[in-house]
């Protein structure tokens, strides 16, 4: 057991695999309790997992004894990592471009996700802590034409439609306009 404990930290790729497995297990455990990781936790996990994958593969390639093969494979891997990074980083930034705010409505704390691409929607989920939120949408506000953050903006935007959901995600009511 002591030998395994001393060996695991020396293999970064194995550590990264363990991290991914832990995240997946925690994701499913949270889902059982109707919870989800907050967006920043997912973003941090993806960043650490990507860095661990890159460093772990380079660490394994450095163990190759033939220098020519070692450096050729490292160059190929770095070129692939850069190419894939150039392709996936904009997609990742686009996927995480939605703003996230902590707000209080009717004395209840919510995590508000602003989706402002083509149409602006604000999706409210129950705030459960700095790492997790409820995974059932509680309120959805529709603001019309996209491209802005109605919560983080200094301007006040009128709500076109507000939809309220129950604990199971079923629609309770839909209110048109900026009515109470």
Regions found by a protein language model. Give the residues of each.
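Membrane-associated alpha-helix detector
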Residues: 2-24, 154-161
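Generic hydrophobic, helix-prone segments enriched in Leu/Val/Ile
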Residues: 57, 93-94, 104, 123-125
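Membrane-embedded alpha-helical segments of integral membrane proteins
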Residues: 11-62
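Membrane-interface helix-boundary motifs at transmembrane edges
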Residues: 2-8, 34-35, 60-73
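Short, flexible coil/linker elements and helix-boundary hinge sites characteristic
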Residues: 10, 31-34, 63-67, 79, ...
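Extracytosolic and intramembrane catalytic regions of membrane-associated proteins
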Residues: 113-180
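Internal/C-terminal transmembrane anchor helices
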Residues: 67-96
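Alpha-helical transmembrane signal-anchor/signal-peptide segments
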Residues: 90-112
């Amino acid at each position: 057991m002591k030998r395994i404990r001393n060996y695991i930290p020396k293999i970064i790729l194995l550590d990264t695999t363990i991290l991914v497995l832990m995240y997946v297990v925690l994701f499913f455990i949270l889902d059982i309790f109707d919870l989800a990781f907050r967006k920043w936790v997912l973003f941090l996990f993806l960043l650490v997992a990507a860095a661990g994958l890159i460093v772990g593969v380079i660490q394994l390639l450095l163990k190759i004894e033939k220098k020519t093969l070692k450096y050729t494979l490292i160059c190929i891997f770095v070129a692939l990592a850069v190419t894939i990074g150039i392709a996936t980083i904009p997609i990742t930034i686009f996927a995480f471009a939605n703003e996230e705010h902590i707000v209080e409505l009717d004395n209840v704390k919510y995590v508000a996700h602003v989706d402002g691409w083509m149409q602006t929607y604000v999706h409210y989920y129950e705030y459960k802590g700095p790492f997790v939120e409820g995974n059932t949408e509680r309120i959805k506000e529709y603001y019309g034409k996209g491209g802005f953050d109605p919560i983080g903006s200094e301007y006040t935007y009128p709500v076109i439609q507000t939809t309220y959901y129950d604990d199971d995600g079923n629609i309770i009511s839909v209110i048109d306009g900026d009515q109470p």
